[in-house]
Regions:
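Hydrophobic residues embedded in beta-strands of well-ordered beta-sheets
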Residues: 63, 153-154
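C-terminal scaffold of the Radical SAM
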Residues: 1-131
Length: 174
């Protein structure tokens, strides 16, 4: 399998996007030859070497961030500490939490984030996460070889290059 203008779809997309696809396909060939496999759209590892930190985000986990500028996501609350170390330390010394930003994630936002981040993973998402209105879109992408669907919906190797557009199609149809 060699990356080429034909495999990148030069005839159907602009040259810039085709060149990006060629770059990604060339990288994929080199990484696969070295024993790496993709586990997220733009992340590769040898078996067992996946980044647990990033998987937490993509799998809808929760986390506490410590230190200046650190971000946290607990329950449905997303917040970030103040960025400047001096202000962070002064706030703590004053007995307050150094939170510089906070937001509550709505059910709809949470759902969209689960689909968006989960479909970036090779393991995909539970089929139940996709609304009934988007089933036709999923079926279209399965027929096009970009998704697999069963108990889980996941991008294929070919779909990996188009994951953002696939997610947009699915969420727009729900």
């Amino acid at each position: 399998r060699r990356a080429s203008c034909q495999t990148a779809g030069c005839g159907t997309v602009g040259v810039g996007l085709a060149m990006e696809r060629i770059r990604m396909l060339t990288q994929a060939e080199a990484l696969e030859a070295a024993g790496f496999g993709w586990y997220e759209v733009s992340n590769w590892s040898k078996p067992g070497g996946e980044c647990r930190h990033n998987l937490l985000y993509w799998r809808d986990g929760q986390w506490w961030g410590a230190g200046p500028g650190a971000h946290s996501f607990i329950g449905r609350e997303r917040f970030a500490n103040v960025k400047r170390p001096e202000r962070y330390a002064d706030t703590l010394r004053g007995g307050d939490l150094p939170i510089g930003f906070t937001e509550t994630v709505t059910d709809a936002e949470h759902h969209d984030e689960q689909v968006m981040l989960g479909l970036r993973l090779k393991e995909g998402i539970p089929a139940g996460w996709v609304g009934e209105g988007a089933r036709g879109v999923v079926d279209k992408h399965v027929r096009g070889g970009l998704l697999t669907a069963g108990e889980r919906i996941a991008v294929t190797d070919a779909g990996r290059l188009l994951a953002d557009g696939i997610v947009t199609d699915i969420l727009a149809a729900e």
